[in-house]
Amino acid sequence: MPHRWQVVVLAVLSAVALACEGAGNAGPAPTGKPKPKPGRPSSMVALGDSITAGFGSCTIFVACSRNSWATGSADAVDSHYRRIREANPAIKGHARNLAVPGAQAADLPGQAASAVDSGAEYVTVLIGANDACSGGVDEMTPVRTFRGHLDKAFGRLRKGLPRSRVLVVSIPDVHRLWQLGHDDPGAVRAWRRGICPAMLANPTSTAAADQDRRRRVADRIDAYNDQLARACDAYGDRCRWDGGAAHGIRFSLDLVNRTDYFHPNVAGQNRLADATYPVRFTW
């Protein structure tokens, strides 16, 4: 029969062994730093035109990327960047805005090349308004040409950033803007200065020719959006189409600035961010 002291020693050694085993299986001690939610990127870049550049959203009428729906860092806009940063602080300081006021689809391949150089993990694309708006109806970019520019740009992204996520955003509904503002004195005055003439010239006219012109521009924007969706589908599973969310925004004149009654103000940029932000980064 073992002595009492032997029993005590064995019990103590067993307890120590169990404690050591438990410590070996324990996870690392908390560091105090929040863990990023799965899939949230640590860098991003925005491609496009004046809408994404935040043009007209500041007190002076210039590009204002800090208010951009995509990469904006200002408190006034709950941009994609700020939402991602809340979930993944590693993205802080790693958001570039390459959008240029006046850019058309023809400029997208060059922007895509710069995006590749940045090595961004998340890319947003909103392009096409200027292809419809930059001149008269006959000057609109042909649909086939538009698609060719998309394919070239997306090809560069797919080759240069094969693991990055791409979000393609639909062109907002410019015809709805005309519907909202054609009887607003401030909008009419602004549009007569040459804002998107293909759609907004002679804004108060009900002549058949003007109505037909507006219909043709609306149809062309629909065709561009169709090609954006198709190009994204052809890109593969690393591209997501917004499903027409931006085009479907039921906006009001309160969402555009009071200088040109065309570009989104801070509230409009927020609305774009709300409509297009991916709930999950699972693609």
Residue ranges, per PLM feature:
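Alpha-helical cap/lid subdomain in secreted, periplasmic
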Residues: G110-V266, D274-F281
